[in-house]
C-alpha cells in the first residue's frame, strides 16, 4: 500500500513510509491486511499533521504520516476498544464528535487519542473513550444456527464478522471469536458447545461458553471452505463429520478424527467441501 501527502491541492504528491503496516491485524510488524475491504482515513479538523487510519485496527500519526502509533486494537487484549475492520471515519462539525463504522457497527468518541504499544503492553489501557451505538441494529448476518434437542430456547449461532453466540434461554453470550461458522449443541450435555470460525477452525466449550479449547477436526491439515461443514449423526451419538478436501469422521465424541474419503480422483483439482448431510435412520 502507499500513503501519500499533498500540500498544493494535488499538483504534487509525496510518498510517506511510516515504517509499520497500519493495515495489518497485529502490531504493524507483520505483513498482510485487508485494504480492499476495510480502509478509512480522517485528518484532524484543527491540526492537519494529525491523521487517523483504519484498517483492521486504528492508527494515528501526529507528524503528517511520517510515523504511526496504535489507537485501537481489535482483540480487547489491552483494554476497551472498537470492533475490527474499519470502513469509514466521520467528524460531526458542530460537536466535534468522531464516528467510526466497522464490522461491529457504529462507535462514537469525543477525541481519538494516539497511544503506544509500549504503554499498552505495560498495562496502560487505550485512552480513547468509545460509545458503542450499535445496540438495536438488526444487521448481524448469521451463517449457521443450531438448536437444542432437549432444552427449549437454547441456541448457538455463527455470524459473519461477529463471532459465535450462545443463547441460554434468557441471554445471549459471545462464546467463540472470529467469523462465526458451523456449530453444534450437545443433546446429552447442556453445557457442551461446539463452534467454528472461518476455514474450519473448531472450538469446544464444556462450561456453556465461559472457556474454550481448539479441536483438531482436520488430521491431514487440508484446506477448508469459508463455512466448513460440521454435522452430527443423531442416530449414533458421539459420531461427527467435517468436510475439508475430504470427509473426516469422529466415533468418540470429537476426540479423534480420521478421513473416510479420498477425493478427488486423479487429474481433478481439489476443492473444499461446502455441504454435508447425514441420512436419517440409515
Q: What are the functions of these language-model segments?
A:
Residues 1-282:
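Beta-propeller blade termini and top-face loops
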Amino acid at each position: 500500500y502507499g500513503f501519500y501527502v499533498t500540500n498544493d491541492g494535488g499538483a504534487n504528491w509525496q510518498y510517506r513510509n511510516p515504517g509499520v503496516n497500519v493495515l495489518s491485524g497485529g502490531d504493524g510488524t507483520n505483513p498482510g491486511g485487508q485494504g480492499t475491504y476495510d480502509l478509512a482515513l480522517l485528518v484532524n479538523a484543527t491540526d492537519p499533521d494529525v491523521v487517523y487510519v483504519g484498517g483492521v485496527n486504528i492508527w494515528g500519526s501526529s507528524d503528517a504520516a511520517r510515523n504511526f502509533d496504535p489507537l485501537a486494537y481489535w482483540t480487547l487484549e489491552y483494554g476497551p476498544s472498537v470492533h475490527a475492520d474499519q470502513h469509514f471515519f466521520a467528524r460531526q462539525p458542530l460537536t466535534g464528535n468522531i464516528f467510526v463504522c466497522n464490522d461491529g457497527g457504529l462507535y462514537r468518541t469525543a477525541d481519538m487519542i494516539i497511544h503506544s504499544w509500549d504503554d499498552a503492553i505495560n498495562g496502560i489501557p487505550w485512552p480513547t473513550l468509545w460509545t458503542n451505538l450499535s445496540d438495536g441494529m438488526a444487521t448481524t448476518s448469521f451463517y449457521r444456527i443450531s438448536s437444542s434437542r432437549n432444552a427449549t430456547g437454547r441456541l448457538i449461532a455463527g455470524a459473519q464478522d461477529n463471532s459465535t453466540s450462545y443463547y441460554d434461554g434468557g441471554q445471549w453470550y459471545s462464546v467463540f471469536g472470529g467469523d462465526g461458522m458451523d456449530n453444534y449443541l450437545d443433546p446429552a450435555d447442556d453445557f457442551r458447545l461446539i463452534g467454528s470460525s472461518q476455514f474450519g477452525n473448531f472450538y469446544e466449550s464444556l462450561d456453556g461458553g465461559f472457556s474454550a479449547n481448539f479441536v483438531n477436526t482436520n488430521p491431514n491439515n487440508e484446506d477448508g471452505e469459508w463455512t466448513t461443514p460440521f454435522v452430527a449423526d443423531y442416530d449414533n451419538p458421539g459420531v461427527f463429520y467435517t468436510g475439508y478436501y475430504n470427509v473426516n469422521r469422529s466415533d468418540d465424541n470429537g476426540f479423534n478424527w480420521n478421513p473416510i474419503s479420498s477425493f478427488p480422483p486423479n487429474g481433478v483439482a481439489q476443492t473444499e467441501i461446502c455441504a454435508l448431510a447425514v441420512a436419517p435412520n440409515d
